[in-house]
Amino acid sequence: MKIVEVNHPLVKHKLGLMRAHDISTKRFRELAAEIGSLLTYEATADLETEKVTIDGWCGPVVVEQIKGKKITVVPILRAGLGMMDGVLENVPSARISVVGVYRNEETLEPVPYFQKLASNIDERMALLVDPMLATGGSMIATIDLLKKAGCQSIKVLVLVAAPEGIAALEKAHPDVELYTASIDERLNEQGYIVPGLGDAGDKIFGTK
């Protein structure tokens, strides 16, 4: 599995701000979108372009455009919505697919409860966004769902990732690509990433 920890100074600075215990909902939300935008920049660096001729201000001009690559942005409810606007800044024509996953309290297994996928998803590259890759359960379940629908090109964008989640994702789906602002130390006993960001969903939506 291709794993990219984005070591750009802007990414590291913004993520450092997000780790503050007393950060406001407004600021956390802004930074989640900003890092989402920067991760998208990295994740789309290998898109193929083609030369086309357009009418410029002084006549015909040859320019480069992305070659026929259809994209869908896939936020995992609910926290993934906090990164979506930042991703769309770079790929504004992308279709949006939404997936909801909950954890069964008895089996502790992730269970998809909602999905609304873009049309022709089998022809699209999916940018799957969620702030955290902790155990990897929700991410793996979502990728299972996307592949079942025919989507075979999937890139995962997360703010922070735990080694345990990375290992689980690589075992289940070695063909996906992972882009993260940080590979953190570990999971604690409650399944939170350390040092992590706390509960990203609560911080984005201002809930507890």
Curated annotation (Swiss-Prot):
Its cofactor is Mg(2+). Uracil binds at I193, G198, D199, A200. The keyword Mitochondrion does not apply. Signal peptide: none annotated. Its EC number is 2.4.2.9. Keywords: Allosteric enzyme, Glycosyltransferase, GTP-binding, Magnesium, Nucleotide-binding, Transferase. Pfam families: UPRTase. One of its GO terms (biological process) is uracil salvage. Binds 1 Mg(2+) ion per subunit. The magnesium is bound as Mg-PRPP. Transmembrane segments: none annotated. Allosterically activated by GTP. GO terms for molecular function: GTP binding; magnesium ion binding; uracil phosphoribosyltransferase activity. Pathway: Pyrimidine metabolism; UMP biosynthesis via salvage pathway; UMP from uracil: step 1/1. It catalyses: UMP + diphosphate = 5-phospho-alpha-D-ribose 1-diphosphate + uracil. It is an enzyme of class 2 (transferase). CDD domains: PRTases_typeI. Catalyzes the conversion of uracil and 5-phospho-alpha-D-ribose 1-diphosphate (PRPP) to UMP and diphosphate. HAMAP family: Upp_B. Belongs to the UPRTase family. NCBIfam families: PRK00129.1 (NF001097), upp (TIGR01091). This is Uracil phosphoribosyltransferase.
